[in-house]
Amino acid sequence: MKFAIDAFGGDNAPEAVIRGSIDAMQLNDDFSIIFTGDESAIYALLNDYEYDKSRVEVVHAPDIITCEDQPTLAVRRKKESSIVKALHLVADGKADCFISAGSTGAVLAGATLIVHRIPGVKRPALAPVLPTLKGPMMLIDCGANADCTPEYLLQFAYMGSAYMSGVLGIERPRVGLINNGTEEGKGNALTKEAYSLLKAARGINFVGNCEARELMSGDYDVIVCDGFVGNAVLKTLEGAVASIMTMLKTEIKSSKRASVGAMLSKNAFKALKTRMDYTEYGGAPLLGINGGIIKAHGSSDERAVCSAIGQARKLILGNVTNTISGLISREMEPQAGK
């Protein structure tokens, strides 16, 4: 396996990207890395580490796409950027998966324009895996498509099921649809029609509507929604977790008794923090693209980068792209036909 890594993507690049990549190489020896970015800067950082040089290549990319750039224009104009160069490696079959903590818009636009969608896939979807009370859950879509049709949501269900089955080994992943009630007739025009499609779909274990308060229950393995709703849900969860942690720290410091109690519960708090830490999950796969794409969090540190590479490895070993392709062509096209 070969991974094309945008060395200059993210708030902590390139240092965190290089360090996290070296750490990932020490964990598994079945992949190699192609860094894209300023060649001299990358080699200067690599010189600080001991690593198997036969597993690392560098492709010079002097330009950077920033979050201030208009994504589609930047992808078309900045052909020497680290994102564009890395995506071409995947498109040309020289790398199996692309990993970046850079501009989300540029990754989405570049993946679609350069690597292209899997035949039959109408829209790719950003699909982070999140912790719940009972295990991991995929939320799809989380921002790639603000406006969706019912057919898009049906395809998201197929793509999410393929990932959770291939990567996490979940047999017949339970699929839920975010809605404002659990009853079949609930929702707007989009969710009502999507419900009908999901209920009738072959190869999907659809278990019904999911209210927002049940997202973290662990009763669903894949939760489907349009990108506008998914992005709002994801950011609400991130903000809620951060606020709860802040309130908890404030209460702990409010009295000696609370501080002593916190010390006695230190291991439990540490375990909870680990479960809720995005660095443990690495990044969100962009599903529906004809090659592996992992979008890491913009503020990724070396731990998050290392986890993202581990996620890329599982994505490729799980044969997710081919599974999605087979599902879309075999299960959906004959019945949707749109």
PLM segments and residue spans:
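Glycine-rich phosphate/diphosphate-binding loop of Rossmann-like nucleotide-binding domains
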Residues: 15-16, 28, 32-34, 39-40, ...
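Phosphate/nucleotide-donor binding subsite
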Residues: 51-95
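Solvent-exposed alpha-helices and their adjacent loops that cap or buttress functional pockets
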Residues: 6, 26-27, 50-51, 75, ...
